[in-house]
Amino acid sequence: MYALRPTLRRSAAAALTHSKNHNYGMTPGPLALLPPIYLYRRLLRAHRKYLPREMRLLGDEYVKAEFRAHRSVDNPAHLIGFLTEWQLYAQKIEGNSWVGEKLDKGKVEKMSDEQIGQLYELMQAIQKRGTEGDLEDGDGGESGQKSQ
């Protein structure tokens, strides 16, 4: 029991430090970045655990393609930004806070034309899978007829 006291002091100090950063101890502070392979695995696990099958397949494909594309990046600033955004994404998926969330306008404005094109392609893939899912469910109603 005596050995736990320094740990409790450190925990209390950490809580005070977080509250000084204006988040009042309610939300965790910035986490250390995970190494790429651990983050990659965490993302795939989060998809498996928290997403419906269709979204999981699309998400897994996208994560794999992005990590493959960034394998040869040498710029530390790009790597840190890449890993930070994917880690925030993992936290949102695990916390289920992504549902219905809109993209941050500031982030969209900072995107390159290529990134906006990728975002558009992703949106189209999601919509396409959604309409395919409607047809497979046997709706046969108006939604199936409109997509033809």
Swiss-Prot record:
Disulfide bonds: none annotated. It comes from the Eukaryota. Belongs to the complex I LYR family. SDHAF3 subfamily. Interacts with the iron-sulfur protein subunit within the SDH catalytic dimer. The gene is acu-17. This is Succinate dehydrogenase assembly factor 3, mitochondrial. It is found in: Mitochondrion matrix. Residues 1-12 form a transit peptide. Its main location: mitochondrion. Keywords: Chaperone, Gluconeogenesis, Mitochondrion, Transit peptide. Plays an essential role in the assembly of succinate dehydrogenase (SDH), an enzyme complex (also referred to as respiratory complex II) that is a component of both the tricarboxylic acid (TCA) cycle and the mitochondrial electron transport chain, and which couples the oxidation of succinate to fumarate with the reduction of ubiquinone (coenzyme Q) to ubiquinol. Promotes maturation of the iron-sulfur protein subunit of the SDH catalytic dimer, protecting it from the deleterious effects of oxidants. May act together with SDHAF1. GO terms for cellular component: mitochondrial intermembrane space; mitochondrial matrix. One of its GO terms (biological process) is succinate metabolic process. Residues 129-148 are annotated as: Disordered.
